[in-house]
């Protein structure tokens, strides 16, 4: 598995992925794709068999109450997985790293993420929630 980290997230997430032996992981900026629109980036993600990591969850999985109804992955029949890190507006690097670490622990438990989403969310009550589901829904 290799992660592609969205440009809205810290480059340090790549370092964490590499430390955890996901050595082919990279960042949108490092690959020269900075500024690409989501619809331009999606074919690159899919063709490269990347597991995409973003905080722009709604753009890729659609609304939280109806994932897959809209968003870049709504019409994708097969993908290498999507990791959504959900936190407050302007989430800092430390929180991004904490949420990504939790996602990596979830992947240690079950590494098969093909056609799945892992969402790690810092809820309003400061609890961390981990949600894993199929996308597209079966």
Task: Walk through the language-model features, giving the residues of each.
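Short His-Asn-centered micro-motif
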Residues: 5-7, 54-56, 85
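Acidic, metal-binding active-site segment of PIN/NYN-like and related structure-specific nucleases
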Residues: 38, 45-67
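N-terminal first-folded block
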Residues: 5-48
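Mid-chain, well-packed structural core segment of small domains
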Residues: 60-102
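Extreme N-terminal starter segment of soluble prokaryotic enzymes
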Residues: 1-2
């Amino acid at each position: 598995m290799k992660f592609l980290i969205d440009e809205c997230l810290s480059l340090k997430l790549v370092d964490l992925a590499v430390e955890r032996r996901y050595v082919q992981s990279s960042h949108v900026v490092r690959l020269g794709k900075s500024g690409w629109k989501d619809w331009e980036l999606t074919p690159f993600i899919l063709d490269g068999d990347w597991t995409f990591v973003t905080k722009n969850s709604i753009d890729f999985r659609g609304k939280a109450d109806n994932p897959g109804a809209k968003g870049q992955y709504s019409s994708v029949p097969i993908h290498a997985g999507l990791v959504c890190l959900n936190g407050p507006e302007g989430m800092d690097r430390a929180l991004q790293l904490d949420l990504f670490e939790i996602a990596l622990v979830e992947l240690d438990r079950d590494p098969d993420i093909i056609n799945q989403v892992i969402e790690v969310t810092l809820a309003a009550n400061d609890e961390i929630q981990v949600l894993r589901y199929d996308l597209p829904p079966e």
